């Protein structure tokens, strides 16, 4: 009854108006699962490869080749297989692709099928997706990291860092955490308007004002927090995504907005200064993706008082994560399903992190869709943290709203532990 009888891929558009892959997987019992695949702007060099068409159509970004692979080779391989055996299905697609980075069939094609198989199987059992993937122990709601000021590759402004996030560590529930964030978001908008800055939003729904430095952005956020009546550090903490690979050139970190360059030692000292000066509890990609020595220095300097997250460093890849664990680089991993390309490999990366005492944070991409899969995945894996953008744009709010629903479904079983960083 749960055997795959059809797979239909199609080209749809993501939140940036670029083509992406959507997949329907149909089972013999009549149910189907549908998933749409996200896409990143600042992508790590070691990520699985999404297949694009090239040529003039959609300025080269079409995904008809990936769709053809889904409707052809992949369906031929998976037709008749049992959707309940996620690992075997994912391994079959990896073997069919035959490359180390999924470049032949495309990680976007493979991932769309992988996620849709899980959704179809969950429906077959009559279970919510988070319960199907995570079992009976899935009841931890994530602390959201809300990206309310955008810079770097996510915005057209001089700010070098990519994301400035608020984290409602003192909220009693996930629903209240969303309220805290929304109130600060709208207060920040008023502050920016009063100061003469534009309030257009970037790819992830955060504001993209023409600020010059990280400190300027953080100070605006601090004012917004206190203006709402919240206590910085106690109720609302701050997080940064430096995306430092984007401005790492010739072994230097080139801050164009500030007009200065920092070597590795100076970069470590600068980030340590920010952590000492503000209630910053998490920094993502503080060093460049291949600056392993810099990562080790940063972890030794502030890893005991700040979550240091590897995104471009680890790219949701268990092998790279194990290298980092051995070296003592970072203490957490960002999990993006499209960086690795299958649900099974994603779950393996999370398990590898947890076994080593590293935290795992589930994340969206800057090019998103209305698909809320990562909301369920966060609860399923008890990761306890999620990055899914600001309090604007329906592609971001789809995930927050799904988490509110999950919290409601869980009832008295639901737990929200905003103060994870104090444990």
Curated annotation (Swiss-Prot):
SMART domains: Enolase_C, Enolase_N
Protein residues bound to Mg(2+): 241, 284, 311
Cofactor notes: Binds a second Mg(2+) ion via substrate during catalysis.
Keyword presence, Cell cycle: no
Keywords, alphabetical: Cytoplasm, Glycolysis, Lyase, Magnesium, Metal-binding, Secreted
Cellular component annotations (GO), alphabetically ordered: cell surface; extracellular region; phosphopyruvate hydratase complex
GO molecular function terms attached to this record: magnesium ion binding; phosphopyruvate hydratase activity
UniProt pathway: Carbohydrate degradation; glycolysis; pyruvate from D-glyceraldehyde 3-phosphate: step 4/5
Catalytic reaction equation(s): (2R)-2-phosphoglycerate = phosphoenolpyruvate + H2O
Positions of the catalytic residues: 204, 336
Cofactor(s) for this UniProt protein: Mg(2+)
GO biological process: glycolytic process
Keyword Lyase: yes
UniProt subcellular location: Cytoplasm; Secreted; Cell surface
One Pfam assignment: Enolase_N
Chain sites annotated for binding (2R)-2-phosphoglycerate: 162, 336, 365-366, 387
InterPro entries linked: Enolase (IPR000941), Enolase-like_C_sf (IPR036849), Enolase-like_N (IPR029017), Enolase_C (IPR020810), Enolase_CS (IPR020809), Enolase_N (IPR020811)
EC number(s) per entry: 4.2.1.11
Top-rank taxon: Bacteria
Function of the protein: Catalyzes the reversible conversion of 2-phosphoglycerate (2-PG) into phosphoenolpyruvate (PEP). It is essential for the degradation of carbohydrates via glycolysis.
Protein name, per record: Enolase
Organism of derivation: Bartonella bacilliformis (strain ATCC 35685 / KC583 / Herrer 020/F12,63)
């Amino acid at each position: 009854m749960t055997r795959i009888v059809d797979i239909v891929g199609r080209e749809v558009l993501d939140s940036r108006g670029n083509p992406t892959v959507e997949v329907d997987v149909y089972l013999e019992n009549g149910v189907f699962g549908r998933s749409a695949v996200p896409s990143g702007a600042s992508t790590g060099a070691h990520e699985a490869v999404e297949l694009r068409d090239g040529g003039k159509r959609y300025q080269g970004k079409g995904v008809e080749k990936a769709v053809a692979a889904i409707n052809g080779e992949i369906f031929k391989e998976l037709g008749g297989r049992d959707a309940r055996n996620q690992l075997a299905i994912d391994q079959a697609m990896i073997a069919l692709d035959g490359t180390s980075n999924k470049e032949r069939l495309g990680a976007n094609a493979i991932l769309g099928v992988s996620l849709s198989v899980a959704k179809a199987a969950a429906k077959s059992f009559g279970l919510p997706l988070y319960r199907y993937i995570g079992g009976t122990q899935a009841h931890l709601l994530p602390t959201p990291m809300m990206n309310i000021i955008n810079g770097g590759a996510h915005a057209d402004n001089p700010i070098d860092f990519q994301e400035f996030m608020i984290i409602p560590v003192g909220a009693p529930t996930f629903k209240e955490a969303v309220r805290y964030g929304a109130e600060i978001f709208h207060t920040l908008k008023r502050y920016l308007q009063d100061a003469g800055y534009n309030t257009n939003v970037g790819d992830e729904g955060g504001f993209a004002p023409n600020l010059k430095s990280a400190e300027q952005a953080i100070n605006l956020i601090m004012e917004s927090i206190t203006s709402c009546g919240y206590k910085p550090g106690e109720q609302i903490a701050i997080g940064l995504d430096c995306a430092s690979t984007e401005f790492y050139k010739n072994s230097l970190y080139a801050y164009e907005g500030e007009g200065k360059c920092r070597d590795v030692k100076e970069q470590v000292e600068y980030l340590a200064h920010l952590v000492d000066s503000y209630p910053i509890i998490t920094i993502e990609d503080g060093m460049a993706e291949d600056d392993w020595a810099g990562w080790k220095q940063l972890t030794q300097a502030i890893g005991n008082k700040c979550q240091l997250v590897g995104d471009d460093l680890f790219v949701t890849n268990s092998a790279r994560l194990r290298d980092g664990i051995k070296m003592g680089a970072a203490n957490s991993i960002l999990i993006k399903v499209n960086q690795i390309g299958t649900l099974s490999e994603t779950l393996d990366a999370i398990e590898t992190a947890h076994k080593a005492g590293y935290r795992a944070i589930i994340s969206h991409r800057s090019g998103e869709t209305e698909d809320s899969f990562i909301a369920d995945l966060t609860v399923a894996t008890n990761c306890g943290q999620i990055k899914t953008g600001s309090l604007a744009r329906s592609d971001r709010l789809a995930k927050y709203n799904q988490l509110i629903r999950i919290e409601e479904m869980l009832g008295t079983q639901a737990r929200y532990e905003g103060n994870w960083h104090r444990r």
